[in-house]
Amino acid sequence: MSDRMQAYIEQLGRQARAASRVLATASTERKNAALIAAAAALRLRANDLLEANRIDVDGVRKAGKPDAFIDRLMLDGARIEGVASAVEAIATLPDPVGRVLAEIDRPNGLRIERVAVPLGVIGMIYESRPNVGADAGALCLKSGNAVILRGGSESLNSTRIIVECMKEGLREADLPEDAIQMIDTANRDAVKHLLQCTQFVDLVIPRGGKGLVTLVRDQARVPTLLHLDGNCHTYVHAGADLDKAVAIIENAKLRRTGICGATESLVIDESVAADLLPRLIDRMTVCEFRGDPAAVTIDPRVKPADDSDWDTEYLDACLSVKIVDGLEAGINHVAAHSSGHTDAIVTEDADAATCFLAMIDSAVVMHNASTQFSDGGEFGMGAEIGIATGKMHARGPVGLEQLTSFKYLVHGEGQTRP
């Protein structure tokens, strides 16, 4: 089985490599036409996609998966329209390919340009959320990259319809269908072989839980762009407007609990905790609060936290609460437990905000805003392929620009080097 799976992945890679050479020089107009046609196909086949998604959702319900997991998987008419609209939005964005990043005129007459080019072939491994396949396919297409999608086994039926719609867009624009492919099997050996397919795959991007990302990090021979878990913090400083803080925290936790930008840990300055915490518990009635002894003393509705709570991405209606003595203690707690995704401060004190923004070394750091804004669409990228929490190549929401590399074009008039 393993040899057959390796051959299957290599065949997908070979086809993707051939398609990537065509995409690398495809005009912006053709790429945009493919995206618009793909969005139309998603709308046209909405009923097919809903039925496929129903089968997927029924499967995870029978398996006893939690509600937050089911929410990430589930599609409805509004979410399908959102997927189609996101694909269309990418068509309206500037094409990053061919953009001149720098120009150098040398004393010997050589003119050198640094120009943005596609990465080549991208492997995208993700869990649960079928819309990730459409976002990744659209972003890779617009940036001139071929992509091999490996969705979670729980979303196999939904992913299959989405990929068929994306391929329909490619056909309409006379671009190679192999530019967007999926690994159409739940066999886990497929992931291992994709991670080791150095001959054909230039970059692998995992998007999912800590287990998936750790597996990719440990087994990959192909370069990776890691999207770690979102243990996001919101710190309420002594100088916060508490009405503003309540609204921000409720949105940051409960708007959608199952996304990586949801706040998982609340850090409160002790000077405002007795006022703020009971207000939050009264308002956020569906949320479970787990706190340190100081938080439990303020409001007995808070359940005692243990050490693991400070490092847990709940992806559910649960929030850890830490009471701290001042800005330095707040920064130290966030720095010790953040996953490097997104962290926020709520305060009207400009100096405190400046200090927090400088000292917290996360991909996204916010002031007086919900952490759920940590999203490529909200950043004007149209969509995102993930949130990179590392520091190399790309950081934060990964959009079109981050899916390109560059090469140097050197223009001469017969110069020879002495």
From Swiss-Prot:
| Location of this chain's protein in the cell | Cytoplasm
What is this enzyme's class at the first EC digit? oxidoreductase
Q: Which GO terms describe its molecular function?
A: glutamate-5-semialdehyde dehydrogenase activity; NADP binding
Q: Which GO terms describe its cellular component?
A: cytoplasm
Looking up Pfam families in the UniProt record yields:
Aldedh
Give the GO biological process terms: L-proline biosynthetic process
Q: In which pathway does it act?
A: Amino-acid biosynthesis; L-proline biosynthesis; L-glutamate 5-semialdehyde from L-glutamate: step 2/2
Q: Does the keyword Cytoplasm apply?
A: yes
Q: Which domain of life is it from?
A: Bacteria
Report disulfide bridges, numbered on this chain: none
Q: What is its main location?
A: cytoplasm
Q: Which InterPro entries match?
A: Ald_DH/histidinol_DH, Ald_DH_C, Ald_DH_N, Aldehyde_DH_dom, Glu-5-SA_DH, GPR_dom
Role description: Catalyzes the NADPH-dependent reduction of L-glutamate 5-phosphate into L-glutamate 5-semialdehyde and phosphate. The product spontaneously undergoes cyclization to form 1-pyrroline-5-carboxylate.
- The molecule here is called Gamma-glutamyl phosphate reductase
Query: What species does this protein belong to?
Result: Maricaulis maris (strain MCS10) (Caulobacter maris)
Q: What is the lineage of its organism?
A: Bacteria, Pseudomonadati, Pseudomonadota, Alphaproteobacteria, Maricaulales
